[in-house]
Amino acid sequence: MTAKLIDGKAIAASLRQQIAKRVAERSQQGLRTPGLAVILVGSDPASQVYVSHKRKDCEEVGFISQAYDLPAETTQVALTNLIDRLNEDAAVDGILLQLPLPAHLDASLLLERIRPDKDVDGFHPYNVGRLAQRIPLLRPCTPKGIIALLESTGVDLYGLDAVVVGASNIVGRPMAMELLLAGCTVTVTHRFTKDLAGHVSRADLVVVAAGKPGLVKGEWIKPGAIVIDVGINRQDDGKLVGDVVYETALPRAGWITPVPGGVGPMTRACLLENTLYAAETLHD
């Protein structure tokens, strides 16, 4: 048996087409164009690449993209003032603060400063709390995108034993809440977990978001399980690999996401979807 690939690139492209169609319809109806403000502080190369992709995505679907490229020495006060200004700008439906930030800045305070109805990354405590209360509003982009990938398989998630490897605020914790909403029985593992292999080997569905290349071995995968690899790690030879040993997981899994081309494109597409939702549902 060889796993079926979950093509995040194709699914994300389809979602972007749907968003672009809706933006065009809004224009024909005389409604304003959704706007996304993207804030980049400093010159981290990976962040610069991510931000350029997000701006290109905005252009593709017809959004207005406001770019704020700030020097690394930007102060907490200056950044807070910018966020306050964007919060009050009626042309801005979403505010994206690219992480990580330089060490002297308090990311938690800045993310909380973004108005919850413009928090299209879904990181604000209000939006995370809504998800925990089972009344999601703006959902964290990566877990939201993963749910869309899982739905594309047609597999019924109700009652599945799911294991999330990694407990970050960005992926692991909100992912566990999304899977609970989807009807799974969820185990969250982390750096202190004993017998990670045992947990993974019992799982019908594994979501790996640890940021450690090759952490999950192919032989751990339960035959027929769904494997979602969120990790994206660059090796010394320049090759991008995930947190799962893909080559040995492929013959055991039922479904698997490739790296790259799996989760990453869906994260970006869901950012656009959240921005459109904010424009239409929260701001119009």
From Swiss-Prot:
SUPFAM superfamilies: Aminoacid dehydrogenase-like, N-terminal domain, NAD(P)-binding Rossmann-fold domains. One of its GO terms (biological process) is methionine biosynthetic process. NADP(+) binds at G166, A167, S168, I232. Keywords: Amino-acid biosynthesis, Histidine biosynthesis, Hydrolase, Methionine biosynthesis, Multifunctional enzyme, NADP, One-carbon metabolism, Oxidoreductase, Purine biosynthesis. It comes from the Bacteria. It catalyses: (6R)-5,10-methylene-5,6,7,8-tetrahydrofolate + NADP(+) = (6R)-5,10-methenyltetrahydrofolate + NADPH; (6R)-5,10-methenyltetrahydrofolate + H2O = (6R)-10-formyltetrahydrofolate + H(+). One of its GO terms (cellular component) is cytosol. Its EC number is 1.5.1.5, 3.5.4.9. Pathway: One-carbon metabolism; tetrahydrofolate interconversion. GO terms for molecular function: methenyltetrahydrofolate cyclohydrolase activity; methylenetetrahydrofolate dehydrogenase (NADP+) activity. The keyword Metal-binding does not apply. Catalyzes the oxidation of 5,10-methylenetetrahydrofolate to 5,10-methenyltetrahydrofolate and then the hydrolysis of 5,10-methenyltetrahydrofolate to 10-formyltetrahydrofolate. Belongs to the tetrahydrofolate dehydrogenase/cyclohydrolase family. HAMAP family: THF_DHG_CYH (MF_01576). Homodimer. This is Bifunctional protein FolD 1. The gene is folD1.
